Amino acid sequence: MKHLLILFLLLTTNAFAQGPFGDYAVVKDKDGYVNIRAKENVKSKIVGTLPNNTLVYEFLDEEFNPSNWVHIDSGYVHKSRLKMVSEFPSIGKGKEQGNSITIAGKGIIVTLTKQPFDKTKHKITKKKHKEYSEYIIDGKKIYGRDNDEFLPKDHYKSITVTINGKNVPIPKSAYDDLYEIGIWDTNNFAYYDKEDDVLYIIAHNGDGYLAYEVCWQIVKGEYKTRIIGEPL
């Protein structure tokens, strides 16, 4: 009986444990771009290129990727051609106030605000899979929940960014599928690449095996893209 209990605890712990996250990085090469190789070799066939400041999400830590090569798109890129976003200067530490957190510094102000989820204001459907069903909200797969047992508690109300007094519009589509928001200074960060005028905002949301992170990229005062990162 004791052995069965231990086995049960191990299985349930693994089921709800959060695995390691990857790293956000950008292409940085003196040539202005990096070659994508078919194989992990500098003499391998070039199957594509990525321009500088292309945002990627990969496992760069040697523990998970002992090779000097990273698999991106249809091939491989050498690690030396990537710079981790967290290596750029932080604009400052976030300050929490109610349902918002503001990160400010270097002429930049970033405010992320969450609000309770009101099911009466959204179209909610279910997508059935072989062994479970998941909620689809406003036609989108959602992050922070993975089944139809519970509706999300909260989601982003807005994300506002100003750079040197100029407002940077962030489209609703950049955050309207993100739920279970963490408004803490240990979950939210902003980094600025002054040389190329690129702002990166990173948020960690969700909990346990449903945790996720997101990085928004703003290039020369305009929103460009985002990448969602999920643990292994």
Where would I find each of the regions flagged by the language model?
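Sec-dependent N-terminal signal peptides
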Residues: 3-13
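Surface-exposed beta-loop interaction hotspot
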Residues: 76-141
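Acidic, glycine-rich flexible loop segments
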Residues: 172-214
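Short alpha-helix capping/helix-loop boundary micro-motifs
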Residues: 40-45
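SH3/SH3-like beta-barrel superfamily modules
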Residues: 19-25, 33, 46-82
